[in-house]
Every structure is written in structure tokens, then in C-alpha cells.
Amino acid sequence: MERPPGLRPGAGGPWEMRERLGTGGFGNVCLYQHRELDLKIAIKSCRLELSTKNRERWCHEIQIMKKLNHANVVKACDVPEELNILIHDVPLLAMEYCSGGDLRKLLNKPENCCGLKESQILSLLSDIGSGIRYLHENKIIHRDLKPENIVLQDVGGKIIHKIIDLGYAKDVDQGSLCTSFVGTLQYLAPELFENKPYTATVDYWSFGTMVFECIAGYRPFLHHLQPFTWHEKIKKKDPKCIFACEEMSGEVRFSSHLPQPNSLCSLVVEPMENWLQLMLNWDPQQRGGPVDLTLKQPRCFVLMDHILNLKIVHILNMTSAKIISFLLPPDESLHSLQSRIERETGINTGSQELLSETGISLDPRKPASQCVLDGVRGCDSYMVYLFDKSKTVYEGPFASRSLSDCVNYIVQDSKIQLPIIQLRKVWAEAVHYVSGLKEDYSRLFQGQRAAMLSLLRYNANLTKMKNTLISASQQLKAKLEFFHKSIQLDLERYSEQMTYGISSEKMLKAWKEMEEKAIHYAEVGVIGYLEDQIMSLHAEIMELQKSPYGRRQGDLMESLEQRAIDLYKQLKHRPSDHSYSDSTEMVKIIVHTVQSQDRVLKELFGHLSKLLGCKQKIIDLLPKVEVALSNIKEADNTVMFMQGKRQKEIWHLLKIACTQSSARSLVGSSLEGAVTPQTSAWLPPTSAEHDHSLSCVVTPQDGETSAQMIEENLNCLGHLSTIIHEANEEQGNSMMNLDWSWLTE
């Protein structure tokens, strides 16, 4: 790489010149990189011997650059010591390096032949508008705004535009007017071109011209003519005129509207036209509009801020493949927005499903502003996708976007010969059309992808519920097994002791009813049929994910777009003087692209219908899973209640048994101590058939007393007392020796 004059090989120390970034009227701008630290800076050096006046201008630029500090004005930095030398008696200017190139490079890309995308236009409007406002607030007029003097820098994935080259900038403090200028004529304000006194409004003209070119792909006024020619034809235009073109007849047609095609959303077009009418006013006194007394700034900046602050939601209707846009007033609810969508599309609010690009359904509890991301502008940057929940079959494809008049003209007769200069515009619109078809497919594919992500979210929810259901079913099964075994054991032990212990028909009946309920609840826990349906859906979703139609199928369309771009580039390089050509090859590409789009859209909508059908199956299945889960939980709670109730009854049974044992022990002790004819009458019957229930604990009963009987049995009393004592002792030992350990299991 050629080294700038004055720099000897090796003189830069660790700094190495990597490439020349640009060449201006007096200087070169080169990229320098530090060999060790990976630092990069742009160095502007003088390439010519300068006159005293131009040397002053050069030094003035350095002075201006060093005092500025704004995100949208390129920053000056210190020249590295190893490079800090004078070249042609003027110092070097070191600046931050912006790796994205300049705006001209972006505009020259064939895919931008009909203008930039809306997001790029609005980003440029915001950045450069902010930079110009900053310069003017610091009493600096740039005077040479043009695409070559706007550079792009990627900052955290976002493109930032910066103003460079203040070589022709005018510090207003040095004098309010200036009548000398040597700048770029195509973007020059009329008063500068005519060498008349000027003010800061010259930057408005240049800025408006740039923005118009970014929108349309060409400058606003007879762009194919030299300024000397078009100035005379345009100078008497209406103040609201923002566009002029020459008809085939040679007549100039004026318009207050933006030409088509362009990428601006319909809601942005009108305010943008109003803004351009202020910026492209021929009269410098009226240009930019009056100063707003409240905001203390020209009307053009007020309107610019209004455009940039518009909250616009862009919605792709997947049932019609059409984009609809809505301006969101402050605090509008989502329901209000859905009502507007219903009026526009005919899809009632209850059937609308609005998905973000990540497949998340919009939250009806949040305002409609959730459809708009902060700092993200343009329909090409963010989209919300509208689905009709009442439909699972989306027929598609739909009619392709309409052809412009120019493109339709060559499609009707591809062999017609047109002048090269006219053909360039026609083919530019053809490239825009082909690119548009590809972008239409890409947007619909993003909508399909949102539907797939939504399906996967539903599937994840179904999987979570399935796991919860299986877990609940397994827990119920385990509890039922425990309940069944424990109640069987309880019934067995109860039967063993009831012949000589405690019994209750009412309790026994309740326990048997519990056992029957437990058998019924076992059926509630059977969920195999639901598991089968869920697994079938999982398999279906896996197949949809593997399907080639779930991946982008636009390779052929991209190839056709590139062929159209290559044809257009070849045409641009052909000389335009008195040359003609037909459009046979370009029309072939257009036809093939339409056919390709038709094919991939059929596949896309077929796949989309399967996605939506599968999602509907999940929606239908979820309530069944919820009911099954609810039934299992209810059964689980009932089983636990029955278990608890039975345990309480057992403890009550134990309490009664202990009470009975204590009572009998007390009676036995009394009989052992002293038996008299009077006390013998209180001895209980010894019948083994006597029934003991929970409600009636056996106590000493009154027996028939007879003096005669006492006399007859007095001799046998000692023997009887012994028998009663032994029976009482045996009964107590039997109750205490029962196995009650199951209660603590």
C-alpha cells in the first residue's frame, strides 16, 4: 500500500498503514493499526501543497473536530507520537475508525437501487438529524453533507451513523455569512450553488436530499442531470414539491409525494413527505419551517422527532399474507388493538392469536405497546404474527405482490427495445420486485417459525402436565397399595379379637365401604390412554421438526435474486449514449421467481397447517389431562382422609380396650381381697357369648340375689374367686399382647 507523502518506511513505529479509506480534495484518509494492541485509527493527511487559505481551512477543521463530542459526529483523537509529523506544513488529523464504510457504499449496492429498508432510513434520520442539531447548537454549519461524508459504525450489533469531514464547515462565530465554497454540487443547497449568502438551512437541504435518496434510491430533482441544468428547471417549483422527473416527452413532472416503489410503511409516508417539504424548500428563509416557540427549535426537528417517536405495530396476517400497520396511541389496551384488527381483517377478537417472533402469545393484561420494541423501528425489523384460531388449514399461496407499471410493461413484452438510461430504472424496479418476493417468503417463513415455537411451548406445557400427571398417578397407586394392605391387616386383626374383645358393626361396615372406595379409586389412577395420546403427539411434533418444510426453502429465490442483481450491474456498466436493449433475460428471472415463490409457499402453508392442527390437538387434550389430574388429586385426598379416619377409630378402639382392661383389673383385685355374701352378688356373668361393643363397655351387672343361693354356694366361693381372677388376668394379657405395631408403619 502506498504510504502517505512524508511518512518514511518504518517511521510509524508500531503503527502500520493497512489501507486507504478515501481521498478528498486535499487529503487522504488512511487506516492505521497498532501491531501489538490491535488499535485502529483513521489518519487524514494532506496530499497537496496548500494555499494559505486552504491551510487555514485544514487547521480549522482540526480545531473544530477536537472540540466536538457527540455520538453521531466522528471523534478526533490524539495523533500517536510515532506518526505526529507535519506533511506539507500541516498537521495530521487522527479520528476514530468506523469499520462500516460510508453511506455511498451502502447506497451503491444493487439491492438498494430502489432505496434502503425502512429501519435503515429511520436510523439514518435519527442519527444524522441528531448530529446536525448538535453542530448547529454549537454554531457550526457543515455545508458539505453527502453520502460520502456519512460513515457507519457497528456498536453492539447496532449501526450508528456519524458525520465526518468538517473541512468545509463554517464556524458561525467567525461571521454570519460566507460567500465562498468549493463542495459537492449534487447535494449543495441552491444558495451555496449560486454563491449567495447562507445560513444553517443549507444543511437542511443537503440532509433532505440524502434522506430522499435513501428512500427512493435516487436524488429528488432530475437526478440524471447536472446541477447547472436541473437548477434552472426546479428553482420555480412549488414549496411543497419534493420530487421532479422528466417524462419521455421531455416534460418535467413535479410531485409533492414520494415516488414508488419504496419500503416505507403507509403510516410513515405522509409525515415523511411533510418533513421533506420543509427540508427541500427552495427558499432558504422558509426552509426548515418556523422556530417552535415552546421547544425553541425549528419545525423540521419537531416533525423529525414526531416521526421517530411514532409507535407503529406491524402485523403480518398469516391468513392473507398481508401486512397491516397500526399507529398506537398512548396506553391503548391489547383488546382495543384487537378490535381494530377485527375491523381490518374480519377475524373476530376471540379467534385472534397474536404471536411474537419468539412464539410467545401477547399478554391481554398488558397494553398494546408490548407489540413494539423500544428503539426498534421499521416493519423490516420487528413483526407480530396474526393467526385465526378458528382455522387449522391455511390454504395459500396467495397472489404475489403487484408489479409496478414499469416492470409490468416489460413483462407484457420482454423483447421491446428501450434506451439504456430508461432501462436502468426499469431493471432497478425489477430487482426490487424480485427481492420483494424473496422477502415476502422470508416474512411468512418467520411466521411459520413463530407458529412452530408456539407449538413447542404448548408441547413443553403438555409434557410438564404429563409428568405431573404420571407422578400423581404413581403416588396414588402407592398410597392405594398401602391403604389396601393396611385395611386388610386391620380387618384380619379385628376379626381375630372380636370374639373375645371389642366389636362394632358400624365400624366394620365403614371399613368395608372404605375398601370398596379404594378399589374404585384405583381406576381413577389409570392414565394409559392419555399417555398414549400424548406420546403420539410428541412423535408427530418430532416429525414436523424434522420435516424439510420446517426449514427455509428460499435457496432458489436467493439464486434468482442474485442473477437479477448481476444483470442490473452489467447494465449499469454499459454506456448509455444512444444504446438500446430488451429485457428478455430479466423477465425470465421475474417469471421463475414468481413460480418459485408459488411452490415454496404451497409447501410452507401445507406445513403450517400441520403445525396448527397439531397445536389444536394439544389444546383439545390439555383439559382432559387437567380433569384427570384433578380426579387423581381428589382420589388421593380421599384416600388420605379415609386412612386418617380409620387410624383415629383404631386409637379410639385402643383407648376403650385399655379402659376395659383397667376396669376388670380393678374388679378382680376387689374379689381377691375379700369376698362376702354381700359382694358376691356384684360378680359379673362369665358367659363367653357376651357381646362387647364400642358403645357399651361391659360393667358389673346386678345378679339375682337370694339368701338361699348364697348359702348353697358359700362353700364354693373360694374356688370361684380363683377362676374369676385367672380369667381376668388372661383377658388383660390378651389385649396387651395384640400386635399394634402396624399403626406406626
Curated annotation (Swiss-Prot):
Q: Which reaction does it catalyse?
A: L-seryl-[I-kappa-B protein] + ATP = O-phospho-L-seryl-[I-kappa-B protein] + ADP + H(+)
Which regions span the lipid bilayer?
none
Positions carrying Phosphothreonine: T23
Q: Active site: which residues?
A: D144
Its GO CC terms are: CD40 receptor complex; cytoplasm; cytoplasmic side of plasma membrane; cytosol; IkappaB kinase complex; nucleoplasm
Instruction: Name where it mostly resides.
Output: cytoplasm
Gene Ontology biological process terms in this record:
anatomical structure morphogenesis; canonical NF-kappaB signal transduction; cellular response to tumor necrosis factor; cellular response to virus; immune response; inflammatory response; innate immune response; negative regulation of NF-kappaB transcription factor activity
Q: Which residues carry this modification: Phosphoserine?
A: S176, S180
State the EC number(s). 2.7.11.10
Q: Which InterPro entries match?
A: IKBKB_SDD, IKBKB_SDD_sf, IKK, IKKbetaNEMObind, Kinase-like_dom_sf, Prot_kinase_dom, Protein_kinase_ATP_BS, Ser/Thr_kinase_AS
Q: Which UniProt key words apply to this protein?
A: Acetylation, ATP-binding, Cytoplasm, Kinase, Nucleotide-binding, Nucleus, Phosphoprotein, Serine/threonine-protein kinase, Transferase, Ubl conjugation
Q: Where is this region: NEMO-binding?
A: 738-743
Q: Give residue ranges for domain Protein kinase.
A: 15-302
| Sample GO molecular function, one term | protein homodimerization activity
Any Pfam family matching the protein:
IKBKB_SDD
**Record entry for activity regulation:** Activated when phosphorylated and inactivated when dephosphorylated.
Sequence positions that bind ATP: L21, G22, T23, G24, G25, F26, G27, N28, V29, K44
Its domain description in UniProt is: The kinase domain is located in the N-terminal region. The leucine zipper is important to allow homo- and hetero-dimerization. At the C-terminal region is located the region responsible for the interaction with NEMO/IKBKG.
Q: Function, please?
A: Serine kinase that plays an essential role in the NF-kappa-B signaling pathway which is activated by multiple stimuli such as inflammatory cytokines, bacterial or viral products, DNA damages or other cellular stresses. Acts as a part of the canonical IKK complex in the conventional pathway of NF-kappa-B activation and phosphorylates inhibitors of NF-kappa-B on serine residues. These modifications allow polyubiquitination of the inhibitors and subsequent degradation by the proteasome.
Self-association and partners: Component of the I-kappa-B-kinase (IKK) core complex consisting of CHUK, IKBKB and IKBKG; probably four alpha/CHUK-beta/IKBKB dimers are associated with four gamma/IKBKG subunits. The IKK core complex seems to associate with regulatory or adapter proteins to form a IKK-signalosome holo-complex. The IKK complex associates with TERF2IP/RAP1, leading to promote IKK-mediated phosphorylation of RELA/p65. Part of a complex composed of NCOA2, NCOA3, CHUK/IKKA, IKBKB, IKBKG and CREBBP. Part of a 70-90 kDa complex at least consisting of CHUK/IKKA, IKBKB, NFKBIA, RELA, ELP1 and MAP3K14. (Microbial infection) Interacts with InlC of Listeria monocytogenes.
Q: What is this protein called?
A: Inhibitor of nuclear factor kappa-B kinase subunit alpha
Species per Swiss-Prot/TrEMBL record: Homo sapiens
